[in-house]
């Protein structure tokens, strides 16, 4: 129940205020979520934004709005490399503050975009096991997952994990956690980072 969670965390959200004041001084006022499709970036991101009083954006939706096409249509029309070029351009041009940004799983192929997002805030990697990922994901192409010809979910996972780890400021392991549990870990990690700022 999202409202129940919001009320539960909303009561404690002031404790994070001082940490975020410090983080803002270090250009860390945005929180960018990265990870595989199905890791919960949008689900966790929406609740995280409510708890912190932040805005929320989903960069996949920004891409669809800019292109006036669905992700799967863009991939079909432009191919995976064409899609990545568009994804890089859109993410590299995001200009927001006090915002939780849920990114597409393939954004880590876009170095320009990732450097921009890192310079504008803290990057949180929502880590998920391949087994859990396989259970959560349905139609990959329908979700706009960028797969090369003949590529499997396992090989895609192995290819992306080092990139997620490369760009992450914070890693949150979601194994054995529901949305609420993952959110708690994210908040605690952000608070600890704010305390050190």
What is the predicted role of each segment?
Residues 33:
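Hydrophobic anchor at the beta1->P-loop junction of P-loop NTPases
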Residues 39:
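ATP-binding Walker
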Residues 61-107, 111-115, 154:
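ATP-dependent small-molecule kinase phosphotransfer cores
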Residues 36:
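P-loop (Walker A) phosphate-binding loop of NTP-binding proteins
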Residues 22-26, 47, 51, 161-197:
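NTP-dependent small-molecule kinase module
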Residues 42:
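Walker A/P-loop
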Residues 119-162:
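A glycine- and Lys/Arg-enriched "phosphate-lid" helix/loop adjacent to the NTP-binding pocket
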């Amino acid at each position: 129940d999202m409202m129940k969670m919001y009320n539960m965390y909303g009561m404690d959200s002031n404790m994070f205020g001082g940490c975020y004041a410090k983080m803002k001084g270090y250009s860390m006022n945005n929180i960018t979520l990265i990870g595989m499709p199905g890791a919960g970036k949008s689900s966790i991101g929406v609740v995280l934004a409510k708890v912190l009083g932040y805005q929320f954006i989903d960069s996949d939706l920004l891409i669809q709005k800019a292109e006036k096409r669905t992700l799967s249509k863009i991939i079909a029309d432009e191919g995976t490399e064409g899609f990545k070029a568009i994804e890089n351009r859109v993410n590299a041009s995001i200009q927001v503050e006090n915002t939780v940004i849920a990114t597409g799983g393939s954004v880590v192929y876009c170095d320009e975009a990732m450097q921009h997002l890192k310079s504008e805030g803290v990057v949180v990697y929502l880590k998920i096991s391949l087994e859990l990922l396989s259970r959560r994901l349905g139609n990959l192409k329908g979700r706009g997952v960028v797969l090369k010809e003949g590529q499997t979910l396992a090989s895609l996972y192995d290819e992306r994990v080092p990139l997620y780890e490369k760009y992450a400021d914070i890693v949150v392991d979601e194994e054995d956690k529901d949305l609420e549990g993952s959110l708690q870990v994210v908040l605690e990690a952000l608070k600890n980072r704010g305390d050190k700022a």
